[in-house]
A protein has these predicted regions:
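Alpha-helix N-cap and loop-to-helix initiation/capping positions
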Residues: 42-53, 57, 83-95, 165-173, ...
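Active-site-proximal loop/short-helix segments
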Residues: 19-39, 68-91
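Conserved, mostly hydrophobic/aromatic
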Residues: 6, 58, 65, 92, ...
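Catalytic-face loop-and-helix region of soluble metabolic enzyme cores
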Residues: 100-221
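Active-site-proximal, glycine-rich beta->alpha crossover segments in alpha/beta enzymes
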Residues: 1-64
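Active-site-proximal beta-alpha loop/turn segments in soluble metabolic enzymes
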Residues: 40-47, 73-85, 159, 194-201
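Active-site-adjacent beta->alpha loops and helix N-cap segments on the catalytic face
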Residues: 1-4, 83-96, 138-152
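Short beta-strand segments at enzyme active-site cores
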Residues: 16-19, 66-77, 106-112, 191-195
Length: 221
């Protein structure tokens, strides 16, 4: 009902984006591992939770959000960087096959902090996954992901930590961000959804948020 109520209040030209937590991120938080640095090899117990418990529930949740009117649903997998490379690739195949492939171009994926985006793109291509798009965190060079042959949107990736800085510092960095994005042709950046590398931090000045939105619209619309 919350999605339906929100849509009722949105103008017709605004979209509703739903979200779910990534399976491993949910396990990581539930087991108190979310603050852990470094990579992990998943135990049989953890794989069983992901495959037998979480995947079916998350698939059902995505379906419910789309039926309620969400245009797309993002998978936020902020702890995926904890997985070692072998487990990460195995994990991504499960997420793509069991969740994303059931909802053609209706599910996007976001991970952060050193996650291997090249592996994500490789697996997406290998499995012909109909991914709606990919969120990129602010540690990456966003222009590396612009390609006219790319399928799906690219979302990101101004540094959310800069947003909490004094306005003059934030504005200076935003100008540099805009200059770099503007160096890429319009054809290459088709499908770019401008945003932050992660969410808005709670200490972000409202003035900075308003300026960011205004400046981006003036620069690219």
């Amino acid at each position: 009902r919350q999605i339906e109520r929100t849509i009722e209040k949105l103008p017709n030209d605004k979209s509703m984006i739903g979200f779910i937590g990534g399976p491993w991120t949910l396990v990581s938080y539930a087991m108190g591992k979310n603050k852990k640095n470094g990579t992990d090899k998943l135990s049989k117990f953890e794989w069983n939770i992901i495959n037998d418990k979480l995947i079916p529930l998350l698939k059902q949740n995505v379906s419910m959000q789309l039926e309620a009117g969400a245009e797309i649903v993002m998978i936020f997998d902020s702890a995926a960087n904890q997985l070692n490379e072998i487990d990460f690739e195995k994990y991504m195949r499960i997420v793509f096959k069991e969740i994303v492939s059931n909802f053609e171009k209706k599910v996007g994926y976001y991970a952060k902090d050193g996650v291997n985006y090249s592996s994500i793109e490789m697996i997406k291509t290998e499995l012909s996954v109909p991914l709606a798009g990919l969120g990129i965190d602010s540690n990456e060079s966003l222009t590396d992901f612009f390609n006219p042959s790319r399928k799906g949107f690219i979302q990101g990736n101004f540094d959310e930590k800069i947003m909490i800085q004094p306005p003059e510092i934030m504005k200076e960095n935003l100008d540099k961000f805009i200059e770099k994005i503007s160096s890429v042709s319009i054809e290459e950046r088709v499908g770019w959804v401008c945003g932050l590398g992660h969410g808005v931090l709670k200490t972000t000045p409202e003035e900075n948020v308003k300026f960011f939105v205004k400046k981006i619209r003036e620069s690219f619309v």
